Regions:
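Active-site-adjacent structural elements in folded domains
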Residues: 112, 420, 824-826, 834
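Extended, charged helical/alpha-beta scaffold domains that provide interaction surfaces
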Residues: 35, 309-316, 322-329, 531-532, ...
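Compositionally biased, intrinsically disordered low-complexity regions used as flexible
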Residues: 180, 819, 835-836
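Generic detector of short, well-ordered, non-transmembrane alpha-helical segments enriched
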Residues: 5, 379, 432, 480, ...
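Short Cys/His-rich zinc-binding micro-motifs
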Residues: 829-848, 852
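Conserved P-loop NTPase motor core
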Residues: 1-564, 613-614, 630, 635
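Generic detector of ordered secondary-structure context
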Residues: 1, 63, 284, 331, ...
């Protein structure tokens, strides 16, 4: 009550922000008449003028009003479109690195030209991120006319773009592309062997279109680049043939809430009998157990025409948020192979991860990040806590007059669809257009059959028809149009009302099921009533819908009984709508916890990735790989002497034999103890044990190792030797990183079991992950030095081919959506790291100069 009164007099934070930004709008409007008088050449010259002012110390905020006024005028001359005041407000929000929520049809695409132009003046590049190639192409060509008119370069990246064109695109002032392409380019760059091969430059400023879809809906599935593993696919066929003998509830359990499936004790016993295995959990049978678990998931959780389709003999994933086919993408960890076995198509080899990153961690690397969408306010807390992004709701240019009717709910799905068909029929008779939203291909095709039976002409837009997506959705507002669309397929394309449609009430939205997220439902509703148009929406639900069955039945079923529901009769009551909304809030909170928890796990990998990639860049950028190599040698010697030359014992008792074995194996350097008093290095350098300590021994060994390496360099072209050093260190690093990723996957897979031992799984994951990482960093040094000290570099012409980075046969795909245990925040255990390694704290300093002091 008190807060309501305060808000009434002071306004919300959103109100205060809009009021503050209004001063920018007034400044832009004040310049409009002056800018209009400029000739085309004078308007174009403003770009050079702005760049000069920035070079002389002006800030972007200082030139913002004039730059926005220039873009507004350029847009009028080139596109015939003038930015509304609300679009200027949205432009300022984006420029300040926040999220602008603007209702559908308010002109987000045009709004983005304002901050894009302003920030592109710095010469550091601006990335405009879209959800699909169609929108990237459309916007780069459409809005690109404004940028090009003002003298800025525009680029676009897509999946099959040639490498030289991709690199050129990244040097453009403004670059359009999909979230997947930007993420994969980052991963690919960190697998390259020279700066010349890399395409991305510093990640400066990004504006993410449909930001909720990219940063929230897709946050749980990582981008993965993988190479083929060598495991046989036969086990998937073998196990798949046994699955039909399992009975649900008796032999395996499915938890739809947690999206997991697992064998029961009875199921394990049956499988051991069928496979003729004594103990399924014996380490020797771990691969069989893994295949079995994935097969149970494939049969128990994943449905054809809902989660995937079979097209041209391949299992193709359906994006659960957009309803689009994700050709070329594969589930990881053997799940895709299990689905291929289930559907009886050819099983492709399992992939092993070479590089991966989540969108959460990729987009947090930009110096500045902004986003725009029609629906973000419901997820404001998540944007704030994970991305440090504030959501500002931008007012509409025209008042919203769409009528959102209460939900109607039926007992069964059949009753629901029958009633929906009846309403579509009534509206179709008066030629009023209807957009019908479904949540899966299966449902859209079921509804399509019913409409055909009723003789109603209609269009279907789902993953199977995505090629005609823009055309189908753009016609959805024409007289008599009935369009069935899965989820938000067609998002980003305007639905323009045909002649006479506003008089009929505008476009009617008919939702056939509530989505887990209120935001997705709001997106569907938002297709109607754009820019002050008339429109209406209504959702038809049944107690058999997944959302109500899984999350809301305990509250809604008794409510229905209390309201006296009869077969075939719907209930339309605010109490029902409220109960449905509460079920959605419950799911949203559950999914937020999962994403937040997954981020805590991924942050462990992210810290390691940052350190590893920093070392990789250091090797690539150095002009003298020999220095890094000798630093590595110094670390290897230091680690060895810490064990062998213990200062707590007399030098005469040091295990020189073990030290000699290591030096000969690692560096081809010899040390011996000819008598009780002396050490002899390389047969010439003499050390008296009586006056020796670990530091002196370290120094002498390092001198001998350096000389041995310099002797190897004699007669070899210096530049070629430096090239060989780089390539070998990078090859060793990449091979060990690949193995480390596999080890981390295995660790993550089994870490949940630590909870049974009263240990926190996240704490254990951090600790053991750090141990694995420390061991990998030590092995990088050991293997790099051993290889380079022993390799014979005789004839550079013969060896040139061997030391050229070759393109790898890799697959790019999205990972699986996983769930993990509830988190407990914990400080990481610091373990031993080499003195010259980058500090795992992320400071970018060497460990010895940071936390290793």
């Amino acid at each position: 009550m008190v807060f309501d009164l305060i808000r009434k007099f002071v306004g919300t934070r959103n109100d205060r922000e809009i009021k503050r930004i209004q001063s920018y709008v007034d400044a832009v409007n004040a310049l409009e008449d002056e800018i209009k008088t400029l000739s085309d050449d004078q308007l174009i010259a403003k770009t050079s003028d702005f760049k000069g002012r920035l070079a002389n110390g002006s800030t972007l905020n200082e030139i913002l009003p004039e730059a926005f006024a220039v873009v507004r005028e350029a847009s009028m001359r080139v596109l015939g479109m003038r930015h509304f005041d609300v679009q200027i407000i949205g432009g300022v929000v984006l420029h300040e690195g926040k999220i602008a929520e603007m209702k559908t049809g308010e002109g987000k695409t045009l709004m983005a030209t304002l901050p894009v132009y302003l920030n592109a003046l710095t010469g550091k590049g601006v990335h405009v991120v879209t959800v699909n190639d169609y929108l990237a192409t459309r916007d780069s060509e459409w809005m690109g006319k404004v940028y090009k008119f003002l003298g800025l370069s525009v680029g676009m990246i897509y999946h099959d773009i040639p490498e030289d064109e991709r690199k050129a695109a990244y040097s453009a002032d403004v670059l359009y592309g999909t979230n997947n392409e930007f993420g994969f380019d980052f991963l690919r760059d960190n697998m390259k062997f020279s700066n010349d091969q890399m395409v991305q430059r510093e990640l400066n400023f990004s504006i993410v279109d449909e930001v909720d879809s990219i940063l929230i809906d897709e946050a749980r599935t990582p981008l993965i680049i993988s190479g083929q593993a060598e495991e046989s696919t036969d086990k998937y066929y073998q196990v798949n043939q046994l699955i039909p003998q399992l009975k649900k509830e008796q032999h395996y359990l499915v938890d739809e809430k947690a999206k997991s499936a697992a064998l029961t004790d009875e199921g394990i016993v049956l499988m051991e009998k069928l496979l003729n295995i004594e103990n399924l959990y014996d380490p020797a049978n771990i691969e069989t157990l893994h295949c079995l678990n994935q097969a149970v998931k494939a049969h128990g959780l994943f449905k054809n025409e809902v989660d995937y389709v079979v097209k041209d003999g391949e299992v193709v994933i359906i994006d659960e948020f957009t309803g689009r086919m994700m050709s070329g993408r594969r589930y990881s960890d053997g799940l895709h192979q299990a689905l291929e076995a289930k559907e009886g198509v050819k099983i492709e080899n399992e992939n092993q991860t070479l590089a991966s990153i989540t969108f959460q961690n990729y987009f947090r690397m930009y110096n500045k990040l902004g986003g725009m969408t029609g629906t973000a306010d419901t997820e404001a807390e998540e944007f704030s806590s994970i991305y440090k992004l504030e959501v500002i709701v931008v007012p509409t240019n025209q008042p919203m007059i769409r009528e959102d009717c209460p939900d109607v709910i039926f007992r069964t799905e059949k009753e629901k669809f029958d009633a929906a068909i009846e309403e579509i029929k009534e509206l179709n008779e008066i030629k009023r257009p209807v957009l019908v939203g479904t949540i899966s291909i299966e449902r859209s095709e079921l509804l399509s059959k019913k409409l055909k039976k009723a003789g109603i002409k209609h269009s279907v837009l789902n993953a199977k028809h995505h090629e005609q997506e823009a055309e189908i959705i753009s016609q959805a507002g024409q007289p008599g149009a009935v369009t069935i669309a899965t989820n938000m397929a067609g998002r980003g394309t305007d639905i323009v009302l045909g002649e006479g449609i506003p008089e009929l009430g505008g476009l009617h939205i008919l939702g056939t099921e509530r989505h887990e997220s209120r935001r997705i439902d709001n997106q569907l509703r938002g297709r109607s009533g754009r820019q002050g148009d008339k429109g209406s929406s209504r959702f038809y639900l049944s107690l058999e819908d997944d959302l109500l069955r899984i999350f809301g039945s305990d509250k809604i079923s008794p409510l229905m009984a209390r309201l006296g529901m009869e077969d075939g009769q719907p209930i339309e009551h605010t109490m029902v709508s409220k109960a449905v909304a509460n079920a959605q809030k419950k799911v949203e909170a559950h999914n937020f916890d999962i994403r937040k928890h997954l981020l805590e796990y991924d942050d462990v990998m992210n810290r390691q990735r940052e350190v590893l990639y920093a070392l990789r860049r250091e090797i690539i950028n150095t002009e003298n790989g020999k220095e890094i190599l000798l630093d590595m040698a110094d670390e290897v010697i230091d680690d060895a002497l810490a064990d062998i030359a213990d200062e707590k014992i007399y030098p005469e008792e040091w295990d020189i034999e073990s030290l000699n074995e290591l030096l000969e194996r690692q560096f081809a350097v010899h040390i011996e103890k000819p008598n009780d008093n002396d050490l002899l290095l390389q047969g010439s350098t003499k050390l008296e044990l009586e006056h020796c300590n670990r530091e002196k021994l370290h120094g002498a060994v390092m001198v001998a190792v350096t000389r041995a390496y310099e002797a190897k360099e004699v007669g070899v072209n210096t530049d070629f030797m430096r090239h060989v050093e780089k390539v070998i260190m990078l090859q060793v690093l990449d091979a060990l990183w690949k193995d480390h990723l596999l080890g981390m996957d295995h660790l993550k897979e089994g870490i949940g079991l630590r909870g049974y031992a009263q240990k926190n799984p996240l704490t254990e994951y951090k600790k053991e992950g750090f141990d694995l990482f420390s061991n990998m960093m030590a092995r990088i040094k050991e293997e790099s030095t051993e290889y380079l000290f022993k390799v014979q570099v005789n004839n550079e012409v013969e060896m040139a081919d061997e030391f050229v980075s070759k393109p790898q046969n890799v697959v790019e795909h999205r990972g699986n959506t996983n769930t993990l245990e509830k988190p407990v925040t914990i400080r990481r255990d610091e373990d031993k790291v080499g003195r010259n390694d980058p500090c795992p704290c992320g400071s970018s300093k060497k460990y010895k100069k940071c936390h290793g002091k």
